[in-house]
Amino acid sequence: MARHVWQAGRFEIGLDKPKIMGIVNLTPDSFSDGGVYSQNAQTALAHAEQLLKEGADILDIGGESTRSGADYVSPEEEWARVEPVLAEVAGWGVPISLDTRRTVIMEKALALGGIDIINDVAALNDEGAVELLARQADTGICLMHMQGLPKNMQINPKYQDVVGEVARYLKARAAECIAAGIAPQRITLDPGFCFGKTLQHNITLMRHLPELMAETGYPLLIGVSRKSMIGELTGETDAAARGHGSVAAALAAVARGAKIVRVHDVKATADALKAWEALGINL
């Protein structure tokens, strides 16, 4: 089903043109910018404001690193990281996404107010998560595919048919949400690049995004920014220096139908999309 609007809390986000989700990591150990914006809330808020100036349509705020092999973070620590920033950005009048896989963090944030989207790498598998979101009238949801858990997901991931298996998993998660009373227009899906996938799995998924979107019937949100696949493709070992490859991958995703791209390098991505569209490429 073709859909051109994502119901996301206070906003109906138009998907007729690709949207940019800017990443605000409040973690000391994220793979790319860990510790850069987690020192204090004011540093993080200044970064978030800069992302909006550069062209971000959505801010995605997270307090737990889900990189491969990431250390455990308690729910108390995760909430302590995100709460002061969420409390401030809630009044900015822009779509705010919370990147979390814990029901308790979702519940606290939704009670705080001003949170429009729950972006969950675990696809609402935490106990009570689906029921919590079903009780919300309009909160947007992004369900992501991951094989395994962050601590072990990159240890020899295997698939018989990566596109088919990812599609079936995401369809099943979306179906559970709808059965619980969540409206389909609130749902987007993320195939989970580099979450329990080899480089070849990631390449195959990217090349077959149109089939994945057709099979699932939902808009796709794609996150490839600065990830290991970009490093493997370009030979760049420094995650922070993978911006050029990340922009190219974001454009490749959009060209294949992705509606939202989650990125660190907002200005470069926004400029690339503007130039590409102006030069007559059908996005």
Swiss-Prot record:
Q: Which residues form the Pterin-binding domain?
A: 18-274
Consequence of substituting residue 275 to V: In strain: BT054 and MO124
Q: What is the effect of changing residue 228 to R?
A: In strain: BT054
Q: Does the keyword Zinc apply?
A: no
Please verify whether the record's keywords include Nucleotidyltransferase. Answer: no
Q: Which CDD domains match?
A: DHPS
Which InterPro entries does the record match to this protein?
Answer: DHP_synth-like, DHP_synth_dom, Dihydropteroate_synth-like_sf, Pterin-binding_dom
Changing residue 188 to I does what? In strain: MO124
| GO cellular component terms given for this protein | cytosol
Q: In which pathway does it act?
A: Cofactor biosynthesis; tetrahydrofolate biosynthesis; 7,8-dihydrofolate from 2-amino-4-hydroxy-6-hydroxymethyl-7,8-dihydropteridine diphosphate and 4-aminobenzoate: step 1/2
Protein family: Belongs to the DHPS family.
Complex and partners: Homodimer.
Name-wise, this protein is Dihydropteroate synthase
What lineage is this protein's organism placed in?
Bacteria, Pseudomonadati, Pseudomonadota, Betaproteobacteria, Neisseriales
Primary gene name: folP
